[in-house]
Amino acid sequence: VTQNSEYIKEYCQYAKNNNVHIILPLTIKDERENIFNSALMIDNKGKIKGKYDKTHLFLHEKKYYQAGNKFTIFNVDNIKIGILICYDLGFPEAARYLTLKGADIIFVPSAWRIQDYDIWDLNTRQRALENNIFIVGVNRVGKEADLHLFGNSRIIDPNGEIMKEAPRDE
């Protein structure tokens, strides 16, 4: 989709009507026809505050997506939010950069595969611990052909401890 599509406008309207902030992961095509794996930050007034484009592309993603080249901090009700997408979490420098730029919390919309559960567990906890920051990992759930995405979304405290988590396959 493009950033001004009806699809995105519906989410903006939802945020405004319900007074909520939304981090919306999606594929975005820019004005030069480049395609990015992105996340939009939509505020509770229904305005797009900005977007983050995934910087670390996994396996075959390079065939389809352009890599992003910057990390962004979003100020939401005086809370500084960073966003990483999925495989970005595997690179300590990304979370460290956001922390040094003042992030209070990092959200990580993801699509981790069941065979990588141990890495998901380690990365979410380690990035929180090494940066003394909250991590909210939101992992997709479901099956697509032979791809099993296991859920297990979680909130990690700055000590690397799991505060709350959904079970696998939820």
Please report, for each region that a protein language model flagged, where it lies by residue.
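Recurrent small/Gly-Pro-centered beta-turn motifs in extracellular repeat architectures
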Residues: 26-28
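CN hydrolase (nitrilase-like) catalytic-core segments centered on the catalytic cysteine
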Residues: 3-23, 90-170
